[in-house]
C-alpha cells in the first residue's frame, strides 16, 4: 500500500503556475474605481524571473494534439447536440491556451463581435488578459456579449498575472505573491469556507490552480462564470444544486434530455483524494523545485507529469521506485477506463432507446423519470472522466462516481424497456455504426465538411485581424 510521508515534502514551491482554468459566483461588480495594474504580457517579467519564465515558455514543447473523439467515438453520441460532439482534444501545454480555444470547432466561426455560438466566458481560463479586462471593465463589462468580442483583447497565453500579483513590490523582489485574479473564484472559495486571504501558503498554492481547474457553469443573462459549490463539492452535491436551479448546458439531440457537461474538476477530485486530504498541493507534484545551471533552486513552471521529475516530486514522499509507482498508476488508470467504457456503452444505448420511445409517441410525463436518470448518470460519468488525472488524484472517488453512473444508466434502460413495451416495441433498438468519430458524427447529423471549412476560413481571415488590432493597441509585444 502506498505510504506518504507528509513531512518529507515541504521543500517545494515559491512561484506558482501561469495557468489553470476557471469559474464561480455570479454577483458581478460594477466598473472598477482603481486603475488597471494587471500586465498581461508575460515577457515583461522575464528579466525579473528568468528561470521561471523560460520554464513556463517550455510548455510550448507540449504540443501534441490528441483527438479524444477519435479515440472514443461514443463521446459523440453522449454529447449529441453540443459543440463537444464536433471537436474535443486532450489538453496541451499552457502556451497553447489561446491558440486552442481559437481553433477548436467548438467556438464556431464568428464573422463579427456579435456572431458565434459561445459567450465571452469561454475565454475566462485562457489568458491574463481576462484579469486585465475584469479590472478594467468590472465583471459585468467583461462577461457581456459573445466570445468573438474578446478576440482582439485576449491575446496573451496563460501566464504570470493569472496566478501572481505582478504589480506588487514583493513580486518584484522575487517572492511569489500568489493571488486569485478571478473574483468569481475568490467568492467560490469563500463559499466553501476558504477565504484566500486567510489561507496558508500551501492552501493558496492549490487554490490558485483551482481558479480554472474546476467544474463551473455560465449563470444569468451575461453567462457569467460560477462554481456550483453552494451545496458542497461532491458529485451528488453539485447535481443537487443544478437540479434545484433547473440548469442544463444543452439538450441531447437524440434523447431530448436536459444535460450537464462537466468541465475539468481537478480541484474537486484532488480535494477528495489522499493527496488533497494531506494537503500535498498541485505545485508539489506538477511544479517542483529544480536547480538552474548555477545550482539555484526555482519553481519549474513547465507544468507537467510528476514522473518527468520523479526525484523532485514523488520520491520526496514515496519509498517505492519509479517503475513500481508507474505500475500502480497504470493499473488504476486501466480500472477507471474499463468502467468508463462500460458506462458509456449503457448511455449510448439509453440515448437511442429514449429516441425510439419519443418517436413511438412517449409523452413528456412518461419520459421525465427516464431523462432524469440519463442526466444524472451522464453527469456522474462526466465528472469522473473530465478530470484527466482522476486515476492519480482520487481513484477511489472516480470508481465510486462511475459505479453510481452505471446504476443510474441501468435504471434508465430498465424503465425504457418497460415504456417501449407499452408502445408495442419489444425488439432490441438497433444502434447505428459509430465505430469511428466520422461515422458517429454522421449518425447525429453533423455536416463536418461545412463546419471545418467555415472554421478554416475563420482561422485564415478573422484571427489575423484580431492579432493586428491587438498589436496596434499595444497588447502584444510582437
Curated annotation (Swiss-Prot):
Biological process according to GO: anaerobic electron transport chain; nitrate assimilation
GO CC annotation terms, alphabetical: outer membrane-bounded periplasmic space
CDD domains the UniProt entry points to: NrfA-like
Cofactor note: Binds 1 Ca(2+) ion per monomer. Binds 5 heme c groups covalently per monomer.
Binding site for heme c 4: 282, 285-286, 393
Record-linked Gene3D superfamilies: Butyryl-CoA Dehydrogenase, subunit A, domain 3, Flavocytochrome C3, Chain A
Keyword Transport in annotation: yes
Binding site for heme: 122, 125-126
Keyword tags: Calcium, Electron transport, Heme, Iron, Metal-binding, Oxidoreductase, Periplasm, Signal, Transport
Catalyses which reaction(s): 6 Fe(III)-[cytochrome c] + NH4(+) + 2 H2O = 6 Fe(II)-[cytochrome c] + nitrite + 8 H(+)
Positions annotated to bind heme c 5: 275, 314, 317-318
Compartments (UniProt record): Periplasm
EC number: 1.7.2.2
Example of a GO MF term: nitrite reductase (cytochrome, ammonia-forming) activity
Principal location class: periplasm
Pathway(s) where this gene product acts: Nitrogen metabolism; nitrate reduction (assimilation)
EC class of the enzyme, as a word: oxidoreductase
Function summary: Catalyzes the reduction of nitrite to ammonia, consuming six electrons in the process.
Protein name: Cytochrome c-552
Organism from which the protein derives: Escherichia coli O1:K1 / APEC
The organism's taxonomic lineage, starting at the top: Bacteria, Pseudomonadati, Pseudomonadota, Gammaproteobacteria, Enterobacterales
Amino acid at each position: 500500500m502506498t505510504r506518504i510521508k507528509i513531512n518529507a515534502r515541504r521543500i517545494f514551491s515559491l512561484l506558482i503556475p501561469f495557468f489553470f482554468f476557471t469559474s464561480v459566483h455570479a454577483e458581478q461588480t460594477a466598473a472598477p474605481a482603481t486603475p488597471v495594474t494587471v500586465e498581461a504580457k508575460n515577457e515583461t517579467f522575464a528579466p525579473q524571473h528568468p528561470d521561471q519564465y523560460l520554464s513556463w515558455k517550455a510548455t510550448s514543447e507540449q504540443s501534441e494534439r490528441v483527438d479524444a473523439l477519435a479515440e472514443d467515438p461514443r463521446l459523440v453520441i453522449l454529447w449529441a447536440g453540443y459543440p463537444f460532439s464536433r471537436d474535443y482534444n486532450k489538453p496541451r501545454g499552457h502556451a497553447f491556451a489561446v491558440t486552442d480555444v481559437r481553433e477548436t470547432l467548438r467556438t464556431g466561426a464568428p464573422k463579427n463581435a456579435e456572431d458565434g455560438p459561445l459567450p465571452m466566458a469561454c475565454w475566462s481560463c485562457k489568458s491574463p488578459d481576462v484579469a486585465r479586462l475584469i479590472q478594467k471593465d468590472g465583471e459585468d463589462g467583461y462577461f457581456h456579449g459573445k466570445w468573438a468580442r474578446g478576440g482582439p483583447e485576449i491575446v496573451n497565453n496563460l501566464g504570470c498575472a493569472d496566478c501572481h500579483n505582478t504589480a506588487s513590490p514583493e513580486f518584484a523582489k522575487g517572492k511569489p505573491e500568489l493571488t486569485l485574479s478571478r473574483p468569481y473564484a475568490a467568492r467560490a472559495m469563500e463559499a466553501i469556507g476558504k477565504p484566500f486571504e486567510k489561507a496558508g501558503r500551501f492552501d493558496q498554492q492549490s487554490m490558485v490552480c483551482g481558479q480554472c481547474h474546476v467544474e463551473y457553469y455560465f449563470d444569468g443573462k451575461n453567462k457569467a462564470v460560477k462554481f456550483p459549490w453552494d451545496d458542497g463539492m461532491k458529485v451528488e452535491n453539485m447535481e443537487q444544486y443544478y437540479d434545484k436551479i433547473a440548469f442544463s448546458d444543452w439538450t441531447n439531440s437524440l434523447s431530448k434530455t436536459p444535460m450537464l457537461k462537466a468541465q475539468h474538476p481537478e480541484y474537486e477530485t484532488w480535494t477528495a483524494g489522499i493527496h488533497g486530504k494531506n494537503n500535498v498541493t498541485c505545485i508539489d507534484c506538477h511544479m517542483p523545485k529544480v536547480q538552474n545551471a548555477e545550482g539555484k533552486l526555482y519553481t519549474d513552471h513547465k507544468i507537467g507529469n510528476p514522473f518527468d521529475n520523479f526525484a523532485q516530486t514523488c520520491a520526496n514522499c514515496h519509498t517505492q521506485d519509479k517503475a513500481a509507482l508507474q505500475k500502480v498508476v497504470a493499473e488504476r488508470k486501466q480500472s477507471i477506463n474499463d468502467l468508463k467504457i462500460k458506462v458509456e456503452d449503457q448511455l449510448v444505448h439509453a440515448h437511442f432507446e429514449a429516441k425510439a420511445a419519443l418517436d413511438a409517441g412517449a409523452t413528456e410525463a412518461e419520459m421525465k423519470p427516464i431523462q432524469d436518470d440519463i442526466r444524472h448518470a451522464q453527469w456522474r460519468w462526466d465528472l469522473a472522466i473530465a478530470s484527466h488525472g482522476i486515476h492519480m488524484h482520487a481513484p477511489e472517488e472516480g470508481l465510486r462516481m462511475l459505479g453510481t453512473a452505471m446504476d443510474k444508466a441501468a435504471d434508465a434502460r430498465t424503465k425504457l424497456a418497460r415504456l417501449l413495451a407499452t408502445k408495442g416495441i419489444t425488439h432490441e433498438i438497433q444502434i447505428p455504426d459509430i465505430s469511428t468519430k466520422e461515422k458517429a458524427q454522421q449518425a447525429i447529423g453533423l455536416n463536418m465538411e461545412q463546419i471545418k471549412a467555415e472554421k478554416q476560413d475563420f482561422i485564415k481571415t478573422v484571427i489575423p485581424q484580431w492579432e493586428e488590432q491587438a498589436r496596434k493597441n499595444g497588447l502584444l509585444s510582437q
